[in-house]
Amino acid sequence: MPINSSSDTLNDLQARVAAFRDERNWERFHDPKSLAAALGAEVGELLEQVMWLSTEDARSLTPEQAAAIRDEVADISIFALHLANSVGFDLGEAIDDKLKVVAERIPPSQDAPARKADA
């Protein structure tokens, strides 16, 4: 499977990470608990990239900072796809379903509440 296609759908990516896993015989390590733990660790690595930045600095990242964040978000996304495969659901469908729930709760006409950092 090609590894560099920006036109892949989320379903394509979900299939590609499954194939990547299978090619390495990693399925035995990919239970929901282990994948959730790995996902949490990757989120922690993302947080390390921005934890000590001011809100202003976080909005104007250096190219190096942006690249590090990009790598961590990719890791998070890969583990989320692996977790979806392990549990047995279509992540794209789950995202669509969640957006519908949030849209019902928060109509587009509502302004976002101000945050302390923005006030």
Segments the model singles out, each with a brief description of its role:
Residues 1-119:
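Flexible "arm" and connector segments at domain edges
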